[in-house]
């Protein structure tokens, strides 16, 4: 990477990390802490308050991605953390579950993932873009692991309101990063001719990638409905689950070197298909374990979590990299907005699907469904065309 590419990658990854740390700190404790608020005895309302963030984010990803094409990436990126901070402050000051719900909805309105990834694509060459995207994905995975360890400790001292206050402070720190560290946009991007969002939806390979991120996050969130219970059955109490997740996440980052090697050899499509197959293998393994009737063991669950994070992190890096290469530069923000919209909808669908499947079909039925979804995804992605280094009018 050049110094400019390195600065852009690190600063934009930090923006993601600050935002996602705030989100992840709240998630492990939200359902329990929300019960202490008036209205918190309604499980449906608690679930809505948790999920409303993903819904408002999904609605606004595409419009804000298109706005970044028209008005500039950094303007939109500054706006996002400010809105997110306002939502966090509202949630911190809330005295009822309804107030928490409104705050969470406003948090989701700060949907800048598309603008951030579009700016990262603008400021990196195709040859190093997957590495840059992996830095963003890795920062998110690391924040997830940190939050699993820190959330229970922080909640015991500052409560849910304090966590939202901390989230607000992290978001404002993100604004400072945008203003004083993220490199300026190039005149080439600001003066580029504008394209049509229809160009995005007419591209079959972009549609495959959009479908892919929807399935990936549907499967991912569905998994977490059942996996924690399996870890408890294996003898690991809830406050020690990080002892499985943290090593799995960290070791999966080491395995990312293989992805970069395949990218350098022009085999990113092969890496993508291999990662999907890895996620499929994990779903089959978890399903077989759940259906066997035997007590799960950490010696089986630990390696399965490692394999899942290897596949998940590879897909989180390679898919947006491919979107940015395939999309014409004038509609790159719209393309990544569409991609992030489907990602958010996948998170929303995964929570709903996972809960319903565990209730009506148990863990074996859940993993059978996620395995079928992943297998269909692999089949539909197989015709994906190899991408040249200069596709999409890259940097």
Predicted regions and their residues:
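Juxtamembrane intracellular "pre-TM" segments in multi-pass secondary transporters
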Residues: 1-5, 182-212
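C-terminal membrane-cytosol helix-exit motif in multi-pass small-molecule transporters
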Residues: 169-187, 380-385
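Intracellular juxtamembrane helix-capping segments at the cytosolic ends
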Residues: 112-124, 314-327
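C-terminal transmembrane helical hairpin of 12-TM major facilitator-type secondary transporters
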Residues: 270-319
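Conserved MFS/SLC helix-loop-helix module at the cytosolic interface between two early adjacent transmembrane helices
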Residues: 59-95
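Structural signature of the two symmetry-related core transmembrane helices
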Residues: 75-89, 168, 270-285, 371
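Helix-to-loop junctions at the C-terminal end of transmembrane segments
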Residues: 60-72, 254-268, 358
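Cytoplasmic helix-loop-helix junction between adjacent transmembrane helices
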Residues: 103-140
């Amino acid at each position: 990477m050049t110094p400019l590419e390195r600065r852009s990658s690190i600063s934009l990854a930090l923006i993601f990390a600050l935002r996602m740390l705030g989100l992840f700190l709240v998630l492990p404790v939200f359902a329990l802490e929300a019960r202490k608020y008036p209205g918190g005895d309604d499980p449906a309302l608690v679930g809505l308050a948790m999920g409303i963030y993903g819904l408002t984010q999904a609605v606004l990803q595409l419009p804000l991605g298109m706005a970044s094409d028209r008005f500039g990436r950094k303007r939109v990126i500054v706006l996002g953390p400010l809105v997110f901070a306002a939502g966090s402050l509202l949630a911190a000051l809330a005295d009822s579950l309804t107030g928490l719900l409104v705050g969470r909805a406003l948090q989701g309105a700060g949907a800048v993932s598309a603008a951030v990834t579009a700016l990262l694509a603008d400021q990196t060459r195709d040859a190093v873009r997957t590495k840059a995207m992996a830095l963003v994905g890795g920062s998110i995975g690391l924040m997830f692991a940190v939050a699993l360890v820190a959330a229970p400790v922080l909640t015991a001292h500052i409560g849910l309101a304090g966590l939202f206050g901390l989230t607000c402070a992290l978001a404002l720190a993100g604004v400072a990063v945008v203003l004083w560290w993220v490199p300026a946009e190039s005149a080439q991007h600001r003066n580029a001719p504008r394209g049509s969002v229809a160009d995005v939806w007419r591209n079959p390979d972009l549609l495959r990638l959009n479908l892919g991120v929807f399935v990936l996050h549907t499967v991912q969130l569905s998994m977490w409905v059942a996996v924690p219970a399996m870890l408890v059955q294996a003898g690991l109490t809830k406050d020690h689950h990080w002892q499985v997740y943290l090593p799995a996440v960290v070791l999966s980052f080491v395995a990312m070197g293989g992805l970069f090697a395949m990218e350098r050899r022009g085999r990113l499509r092969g890496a993508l298909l291999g990662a999907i197959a890895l996620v499929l293998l994990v779903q089959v393994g978890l399903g077989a374990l759940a259906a066997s009737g035997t007590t799960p063991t950490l010696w089986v669950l630990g390696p399965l979590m490692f394999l899942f994070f290897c596949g998940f992190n590879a897909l989180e890096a390679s898919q947006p990299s491919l979107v940015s290469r395939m999309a014409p530069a004038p509609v790159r923000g719209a393309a990544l907005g569409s991609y992030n919209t489907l990602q958010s909808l996948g998170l929303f669908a995964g929570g709903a699907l996972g809960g319903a499947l565990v209730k009506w079909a148990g863990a074996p039925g859940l993993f059978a469904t996620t395995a079928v979804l992943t297998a269909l995804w692999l089949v539909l992605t197989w015709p994906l065309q190899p991408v040249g280094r200069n596709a999409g009018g890259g940097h």
